[in-house]
Amino acid sequence: MKQSLFLKKCSKFCYVLFAVCGCLACTQNQKIEWPQVTNETKPWTRWWWEGNAVRTTDLDTVMRKYQEANLGGLEITPIYGIHGYEDRFKDFLSPEWVDLFLYTLQEAKQLALGIDLANASGWPFGGPWVTPEDACKTVAYKTYQLKEGEQLSEPVRYKEEGFVRLAGHTPVKLADLKEPVSANADLQTLALDQVRYKKELPLIIVTANSDKGECLDLTSKIKPDGTLDWTAPQGDWTICALFQGHHGKMVERAGPGGEGDVIDHFSASAIDHYLSKFDEAFKGKDISYLRYYFNDSYEVDDARGESNWTPAFFDEFQKYRGYDLRQHLPALLGMDTPDKNARVLYDYRQTINDLLINHYSIRWQHWAAKQGKGIRNQAHGSPANILDLYAVSDVPEIEGRDLVSIKAAPSVAHTEGKKLSSSESATWLDEHFQSNLGDVKKALDLFFLGGVNHIFYHGTCFSPQEAPWPGWLFYAAVHFHPNNPFWEDFKYLNQYVTRVQSFLQDGTPDNDVLLYYNIADVMSEQGNRSLQHFSGLDRNMLESSVRESAVTLTENGYAWDMISDKQLLKTNIEKEMIVTPGAAYKTVLVSAAQYIPYETMEKLMALADEGATVVFYKGIPQDMAGMILSEEKQAHFKEMLDALDFHAEGAVKCARVGKGKICLSDDINALM
C-alpha cells in the first residue's frame, strides 16, 4: 500500500510516542497500553446539510464511507442550498426534516458514529420564528448642551436611515423588503446579511446632567412631536437621549427554514422562545442518540454597528452593578472625566458580559441538560470573558492558528475538570483542493500542542451520489469528503488522530502556571465601539501584557493555563498548590495590570496567605475596575497594597503574606 510523506511522519511520531510510553512504563514499573478506542477518541467532522437536501438512500452510502474512513462522529449543520437542487430543499425543523434527522440518528447508531446538532441553520442563533421583540437590539443616542434659561430648539428624535447588506448576489433594495424580515418570500435566494428598516426609533430615556452633579430624568417632558418641554435651570447641562434600534443581523449562511433575525443574546425570554421551536419539533420523538447541541461562534457583531442593548438593560445593570446607570449617561457616552468614563464603561461592558453568560449560555446549557445532553460552544468573538462562557459549556470549542489563543478552550477544560475540549480544525487552509493531508496534520498538531483533545474537521458536505465531480462543496472548507483525491489516505491520518486523542483524553492535565486572563484593562478602554470582543489572546488582546506573558512562557517551556476572575475565586490551597476543580498549579501570574476587580485582588492575597506564591509581572495593579461606590472596599484595597513589605531576592522582590508570598519582577523567567 502506497503511503505519502505525511504518513511516514505519522509513523515516526507514533514511534517516539511509544518510546516515551516505554520510558514511563520502565520508570513506573507498569505497563502502559493504548486506551480503548471509542467514537470520541476518533476525529469528528462538521457535516453540512446544504439546503437540507439529503435523502435516505444517499445517507446510507455516505455515512458508511465516513465510518470506513475512521471518523468517529458527525456534527450536523444545516446550511444554504445548492443552485439547481431547489426542488429537494427542506425547511429546517419541518416534519420532513425531523424524519430525516431521526433516520440519520438510527443509521449513525448502527454504524457507531456519534451525532451532534447545530442549534441553528447557520450562525448565530436565529431564524424566521424570532420576532422583532426577541431579535438583537442596538442603542443609538443624541446629546445636547444647554445653559441656564435655554430650551432645545429641535425635537428629540432619531431617524434610522436604514440599509441592507447582502451575503449573496441577488440585487435587493431596502424599499422592496417587507417588515418584519420574516414576512418576505424566498429568503434563501435573497441571502440577507443585515437589514435595518428606515424608521424613527423609539425613545428609551432623556436625562439632564449639570456641571454641579445634578441628574434629572426628563423623559416624561417629551411631547408626542419630540419637543422637550423643559427650560434649563442654573448651571451648564448635558442632555442625553437614548433610542432603541433594531440591530438587523441575520443568521449567516442560513439554510431553508433557518433564515431570519438573530436573537437578543442578553434576553432570557428571547433564548427561551427560540429553543421552544426545537421542543415543538422534537416533541414525542426519540432523539436519545443525539449527543450535544452546538453553537458556531458568536459573530452577532460581524456587521454594521453592534448588538449592545436589551430592553431591560437599566434594571439589569442596577441589579448587577448596584447603582443606576441612568444617572451617569454622560460618562457612558465618554463625556465626563476620563477616569469616570473608563469606570462606567467597564461596568456597562461587564453587565453585557453577565447577561450573555446568565441569560444565554447558562439557560441554553440547562435546556440541553434537561434532555440528558450537553452543549459544545465556540465562545470566541463574544463581548464577554470567553473563559467564563467556556466554563458553562460541556465541551468548550476553539478555532484558529495562534497557539496561545488556542489554549483558551483547553485551559477551561483543565481548570474546570472537563473531559473534552474541541476545535474547528483546518478551516480554509488554502484554496479549494490545494490543501493536502500534510497541511491538515500540521494544523491538527498545533491544536494538540494547545491541549485540544477532540478534533472536528471543517468539514464535510453531504453530496448525493449522482452529483457531478467534485460534488457539493462549502466555500471555506478543505473538503473532507469521498470526492477528494486524498480520501484514500484520509483513514490513516484519522488513525493517527485517534491514537493521540486516546492518550490526551485519558490523561490528566499537569500544567504549572495559572495565567490570569486580565480583561479589566481592555474593558475600561475607550474606543470607537461600545463593546469589546474577545477571542483568546488575539484581536483586542494582541498588544496586551497577558499575551506577552503567554508567549514568553511558551517560548521558555513553561506549561500554563489561563484563568478568569470568576474561576480564580473558586480556587483553594492544598499543600502549597493552587487547586481548581480540575487541576493543581504551582503559581498564578498576573501581568502588568492597571485595573483589577476588588474581589480578584482580595482572593490573590488570600491565596498567598494560605501558602501560595503569587507573582506579578511589571508591577501590581494600583486601582480597582469599575465604579466602586463602597468606601470600605476602597480602604481595604489600599490596605492590602500598603501591607506588602518587599525585599529583594535577586531580580525578584518578594513580600511574605501569611504562609505564602507575593513576588514581582520585570523578568518572567526570574519569577518562575
Located regions from the model:
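Short linear sequence motifs
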Residues: 6-11, 19, 40, 134, ...
